[in-house]
């Protein structure tokens, strides 16, 4: 018999279906990626540390030139809180946006993915905390498509089905989960990391190393 026959290792299912477009200059494909997911009026979610960099204005200008008007939301904290998401939802709904571009590091990814997830939900955000079968209570038709454009190497949130948001009611970090929170397309353009401050490059590099050690 196999030495693994009596093993206590649990069986599990794994899936990594995200389409990843990797390579220098791939950011030029952003508009096409959005259109391929059915977006016509996306909201770009980023963070205050990135919003004023040329990469954001260049991406918005390229989208506009491609006939894809793109608004920007960046009013989020380094560790996103529930009220950040609520503000983003207000912008999303008032602008009738039909998809979300998450552009930046982990905070932008978590906030933007949650905004896309909550777009058409009727329950409150933390009703979908990753406990039991909470995720099954979400309306899958109320989740908007997501294109992820990571600018750091640390979090890996661009290929994840979950986000971490701080619940201000009890000051705890909570994980929200749904299979459709996974971005439809990821654009991994290493040139976008060049314009980041050295400190962020170092911090996120250590984050990536910590993930490997884990």
What are these regions (language model features)?
Residues 51-125:
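N-terminal small/polar loop signature for handling phosphorylated ligands or for N-terminal nucleophile
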Residues 43-44, 99-101, 147:
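Conserved beta-strand elements of the Class I
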Residues 120-214:
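A glycine/threonine-rich phosphate-anchoring loop and its flanking beta-alpha core
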Residues 1-73:
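An N-terminal, well-structured beta->alpha segment
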Residues 6-8, 28-32, 86-89, 131-135, ...:
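A generic local structural motif
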Residues 22-25, 29, 37, 54, ...:
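Conserved active-site and cofactor/substrate-binding residues in soluble primary-metabolism enzymes
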């Amino acid at each position: 018999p196999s030495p693994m026959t009596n093993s206590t290792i649990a069986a599990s299912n794994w899936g990594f279906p995200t389409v990843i477009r990797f390579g220098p200059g791939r950011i030029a494909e952003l508009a096409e990626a959005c259109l391929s997911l059915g977006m016509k009026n996306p909201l770009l979610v980023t963070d205050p540390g990135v919003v004023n960099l040329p990469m954001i204005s260049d991406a918005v200008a390229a989208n506009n030139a491609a006939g894809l008007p793109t608004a920007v939301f960046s009013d989020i904290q380094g560790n996103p809180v529930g009220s950040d998401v609520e503000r983003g939802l207000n912008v999303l709904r008032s602008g009738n946006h039909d998809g979300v571009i998450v552009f930046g590091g982990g905070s932008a990814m978590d906030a933007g993915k949650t905004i896309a997830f909550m777009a058409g939900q009727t329950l409150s955000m933390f009703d979908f905390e990753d406990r039991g079968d909470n995720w099954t209570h979400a309306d899958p038709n109320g989740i908007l498509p997501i294109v992820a454009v990571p600018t750091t190497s640390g979090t890996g949130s661009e290929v994840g089905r979950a986000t971490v948001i701080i619940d201000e009611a009890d000051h705890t970090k909570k994980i929200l989960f749904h299979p459709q929170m996974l971005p439809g397309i990821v654009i991994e353009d290493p040139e976008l990391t060049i314009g980041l401050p050295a400190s962020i490059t170092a911090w996120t590099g250590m984050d990536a190393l910590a993930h490997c050690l884990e």
